[in-house]
Amino acid sequence: MAGENTSRRTGSARLDEVIPEFELVSTDVKILAEKYLQDERIYRIWFEYLIPDEIDLIFPTTDGKLNYLSFTKRLASAIRYGRIKTAVSNNSSSNSYGSTEHVCDHGTSLCGRSERFASVINRFLDLHQILKDC
């Protein structure tokens, strides 16, 4: 029985080879599933390579591509949630680059907590330095 499954898997085709191209592009997934996945046949899975050639040229390594995706995700988040360069207003704080960031209440709370955490760590480091010098 295990031999049957192995032979079925090695002899199986990919769905993109079975389904005609025009039907794959134009037909709904539910209709395709009803039409092609009714039998007990096992199909191989394929993944399309979706990264544009320009990205491959600029970032040839996987690590570079992941760093790029991470940066653009953070940039999109910053733009969406109001961290954009604007004129100085009452509800904004200036960062080290001279632009302004509109900070929501959650951001203000996190900044306060991180400042308190940094001050506690600095006190521990000062104490460590004093004890080390003794």
From Swiss-Prot:
Keywords: Host nucleus, Viral genome packaging, Viral release from host cell. It is found in: Host nucleus. It comes from the Viruses. Pfam families: Herpes_UL33. GO terms for biological process: viral DNA genome packaging. The keyword Zinc does not apply. Its main location: host cell. GO terms for cellular component: host cell nucleus. Component of the molecular motor that translocates viral genomic DNA in empty capsid during DNA packaging. Forms a tripartite terminase complex together with TRM1 and TRM3 in the host cytoplasm. Once the complex reaches the host nucleus, it interacts with the capsid portal vertex. This portal forms a ring in which genomic DNA is translocated into the capsid. Associates with TRM1 and TRM3 to form the tripartite terminase complex. Belongs to the herpesviridae TRM2 protein family. This is Tripartite terminase subunit 2. It comes from Gallid herpesvirus 2 (strain Chicken/Md5/ATCC VR-987). The lineage of its organism: Viruses, Duplodnaviria, Heunggongvirae, Peploviricota, Herviviricetes. The gene is TRM2.
